[in-house]
Amino acid sequence: MKFLAFALETNRWKKINGDYRMKKYLGGCHCGKVQYEVELNLKNAISCNCSICMKRGSLLDFIPESQFKLLCGENELQDYLFNKKLIHHYFCKNCGILSFGKGIAPGGTKEVVAINLRCLEGINLKTITIKEYDGKSR
Ligand SMILES: [Zn+2]
């Protein structure tokens, strides 16, 4: 299964289990130039072993664009594209931290935002189920 498809499947799973309580969180880079607000259910995170996720160490969750609001730092974002150039890996030009990325959902035109959960404020990673995704062999 492709990465984004897997991510969306994970999100559907949350809904099916009736635990789809959304909460607002603030997130951003390290220096604070990039800040955003997201609405999500912190239940699962995806840990991927592909070339970039491995080096970055990010824990990801995927949400529709409508649940994401960039508060500041649009001009501080540097886009990094590689491989099939489908996912925009946005990182802060000043501190280098990637707090989110964007891509198009499989078979559609809908934009999906990948949130690096490590960049959210006031969360406890120990309460989140980590799902492994084998991006390396795809
Ligand atoms: Zn920064």
Label the model's feature ranges.
Residues 13-28, 33-138:
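A short Gly-Trp-Pro
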